[in-house]
């Protein structure tokens, strides 16, 4: 059987990996009432976290809010102001999803001092809109977010802060990875944590790790939207469902991505004379990617009044905006 664009369809095993969590979710909806938790009344989900998973954290203590704070990332205090602001912004939302209200408010005050009140609030709402599936003032696609990571990496290289991408072993941090392994199961929390650490690893010149976290963040955005539509995005019930379904769903999506990537690589390696149709499709894809990147750059330029050209070019703020330090 042949699928779209001339690719053969994935085998039944790959489809089962995706259908299993969907079937479980439908069964749960039929057998149990919905336990919807409003966004504004979110409690600390870390209190409901299974003890068996808490044992995976770096210490014997239960997972606490301090592990989600940007200052827990090695070298965070030495990062440049703009990447530092963006990482803090994403992790601020992760703390909020986890119910760490005291840490959220303290970090938000620091973000206000660095980026200004209006710009910070707009960006916070924009991130919430991405996760909840609501329309926002600027629709940023996954491709545009990937382009942002690439532009950030290039900017870091131009300032001489980083060189070539570091080897994988130099980018591994057991403590951070242990936190990630646990947090990724939490609805909402794992999404923003992945986005924040994707930016963090990009600034640390760990581009492979950054792409991995960015991909996981993109998958989580779709999963969180599904859970929100089902009304099961909060509370102990939402946590239990997420812990059961999210790993299977992510594994299925990743296998599909890898399958089509392998198919694409195989088609590229074949003689050009037999792939005229695929070349045409590839040309269209390249044009779309270029258009997306141009659109993203245009959005950055058009949003400059929020930031001022100073923060884009030299990381310096307007005199009335406050301190740059976090």
Curated annotation (Swiss-Prot):
GO terms for biological process: cholesterol efflux; cholesterol metabolic process; lipid metabolic process; lipid transport; triglyceride metabolic process. Residues 1-35 form the signal peptide. Expressed by the liver and secreted in plasma. It comes from the Eukaryota. It is found in: Secreted. InterPro entries: APOF (IPR026114). The keyword Iron does not apply. O-glycosylated with core 1 or possibly core 8 glycans. Keywords: Cholesterol metabolism, Glycoprotein, HDL, LDL, Lipid metabolism, Lipid transport, Phosphoprotein, Secreted, Signal, Steroid metabolism, Sterol metabolism, Transport. Pfam families: Apolipo_F. Residues 36-164 form a propeptide. Its main location: secreted. GO terms for cellular component: extracellular space; high-density lipoprotein particle; low-density lipoprotein particle. Glycans are attached at residues 118, 274. GO terms for molecular function: cholesterol binding; lipid transporter activity; signaling receptor binding. The modification Phosphoserine is found at residue 323. Belongs to the apolipoprotein F family. Minor apolipoprotein that associates with LDL. Inhibits cholesteryl ester transfer protein (CETP) activity and appears to be an important regulator of cholesterol transport. Also associates to a lesser degree with VLDL, Apo-AI and Apo-AII. This is Apolipoprotein F.
